[in-house]
Amino acid sequence: MSTDLRTRVLSEHHVSRETAASLDLYVAQLTRWQTVKNLVGPATLKEVWHRHIADALQLLSIAPEATRWLDLGSGAGIPGLILALAGKERPGFHVRLVESNARKCAFLSETARLTGAPVTVHNARIEAVIGTLTDTEIVCARALAPLSQLLAWTEPLLTSGTTGLFPKGRDAATELTEAEDEWTFTRDLIPSRTDSQARIVRVTSLSRVDP
């Protein structure tokens, strides 16, 4: 890990000393569990502060007032657990993590316990719990599914006032075009701060296209 990169990420996102310590513990946990659970792409661990920490933290700058977050397919806690660590000093900040893989949920639960992250871990399929989480302000998902599928899963939320923030790569425009065949929605394409070819798709006011 580059110490300079860590320092730059913490400075750019105005991370407190306490939060930095929590993020360091998260990175240590991720590194330890990676040896047996393969939580992230092995090559990305060398750039964990850029590829994972900074990539997650940028979502907070898009919705700085939101306190009720939901992360679908949370996996290694990216972005949800990282967001929880960054927001845990704020009153009422809470992130719900939905993950169907029990081994990954074990990592999430153990790391949340060690770091004091304000999260609830749901070991369940998205379809089984999404209807019970409609008080969510922001729903996010990274590297989980095409946008059209994400909209199908989150329809109960995005039709009820929730905002979707979905990090996407260079195919963001193509995924948007495909999604617009099935859905009507208000959207913005926000440039990623960690990858010049990536975009964060912000979605509100979702409805199905009339047949």
From Swiss-Prot:
Q: What is its main location?
A: cytoplasm
Is Aminoacyl-tRNA synthetase set as a keyword in this record? no
Question: A Pfam family this protein belongs to?
Answer: GidB
Q: Name one GO molecular function term.
A: rRNA (guanine-N7-)-methyltransferase activity
E.C. code: 2.1.1.170
Keyword Methyltransferase included in the entry's annotation:
yes
Q: Indicate where this protein resides in the cell.
A: Cytoplasm
The highest taxon in the source lineage is Bacteria
Which UniProt keywords are listed? Cytoplasm, Methyltransferase, rRNA processing, S-adenosyl-L-methionine, Transferase
Reaction(s) this enzyme catalyzes, per UniProt: guanosine(527) in 16S rRNA + S-adenosyl-L-methionine = N(7)-methylguanosine(527) in 16S rRNA + S-adenosyl-L-homocysteine
Read off the InterPro entries from this record: rRNA_ssu_MeTfrase_G, SAM-dependent_MTases_sf
Where, by residue number, does S-adenosyl-L-methionine bind?
Answer: G73, I126, E127, R142
Q: Which GO terms describe its cellular component?
A: cytosol
Q: Which HAMAP family match?
A: 16SrRNA_methyltr_G
- Function text: Specifically methylates the N7 position of guanine in position 527 of 16S rRNA.
Q: Per the similarity annotation, which family is this?
A: Belongs to the methyltransferase superfamily. RNA methyltransferase RsmG family.
NCBIfam families associated with the record: rsmG_gidB
Protein name per the record? Ribosomal RNA small subunit methyltransferase G
